[in-house]
A protein has these predicted regions:
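Helix-capping/transition residues at the boundaries of transmembrane alpha-helices
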Residues: 14, 79, 90-92, 162-166
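Hydrophobic transmembrane alpha-helices of multi-pass small-molecule transporters
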Residues: 36, 94, 112, 181-185
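Helix-loop-helix units of permease transmembrane domains in multi-pass membrane transporters
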Residues: 76-109
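Terminal transmembrane helical anchor/hairpin motif
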Residues: 41-53, 173, 177-223
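Secretory targeting signals
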Residues: 27, 31-70, 102-169
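Aromatic- and glycine-rich beta-strand/loop motifs that create alpha-glucan
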Residues: 1-28
Length: 223
């Protein structure tokens, strides 16, 4: 276990050199600005203040930002050794490939939780700007954390495909964004095409529609 923690720390140190990770966290903090503007304009129905900003972030912000960012970061993690020609160094280390892969995947989950924390903090700031109280904090923290874990899990098949194809970063970005947007559109478009058997099948297989239905049930219970 201690060896795995050291590997995770090593992978995190590698990512520190990449400015993209800092950009993702910064984007998570800035993302609530347009949603807060919508809330202040009264453009989100019966929802107001913190609940409205948080609901918009976890149902419309995280499904796009988190999988897209983690897919690209996953490609960075798995291609670093290839790009820097250090794969031969890993082969002489007394560490199994399974542990190295586990450490890289663990880093993705950690970053997903960091994104959830940034989303929570920024939605709290947006709620305070909108002049509302911070209600249902325990439930909302749970929703943010579980949503982050689910979307992190949902992007793992894409990361595996990227590693398997072993192509350039451009290919990784295109594949990640195509998957993310297709999944996102299914979550909302699928609601209006439930009679189509193909669409019904896809909305029961793809992660975003399933996560969205779970979020809707959680918000309904909280409300």
């Amino acid at each position: 276990m201690r060896g795995l923690l050291k590997l995770i720390q090593c992978e995190m140190r590698k990512l520190k050199r990449k400015h993209f990770v800092s950009f993702v966290v910064f984007a998570a903090l800035l993302f609530p600005i347009p949603f807060t503007a919508l809330v202040l304009a009264g453009s989100v129905g019966n929802f107001t203040g913190f609940e409205a900003v948080f609901g918009l972030l976890v149902t419309m912000g995280m499904p796009i930002m988190l999988p897209a960012a983690l897919g690209i970061i996953g490609a960075m993690l798995f291609f670093m050794e290839r790009d820097h020609d250090t794969l031969k160094n890993l082969r002489v280390l007394p560490v199994s490939p399974l542990k190295i892969v586990t450490a890289k995947i663990a880093v993705l989950y950690i970053l997903g939780l960091v994104f959830a924390l940034a989303t929570m903090l920024s939605s709290m700031a947006g709620g305070l700007i909108a002049g509302s109280e911070l209600s249902n904090m325990g439930e909302n923290i749970g929703i943010a954390v579980i949503t982050a874990l689910l979307y992190t899990t949902s992007i793992l098949p894409v990361v595996i495909a990227i590693v398997g194809f072993n192509r350039s970063y451009i290919f990784s970005i295109i594949l990640t964004f195509f998957y993310t947007m297709f999944d996102y559109m299914l979550a909302y478009g699928g609601m209006f095409a439930t009679t189509d058997p193909v669409m019904k099948l896809l909305t029961n297989i793809m992660p975003a529609p399933i996560i969205y239905r779970w979020q809707a049930s959680m918000f309904a219970e909280a409300g």
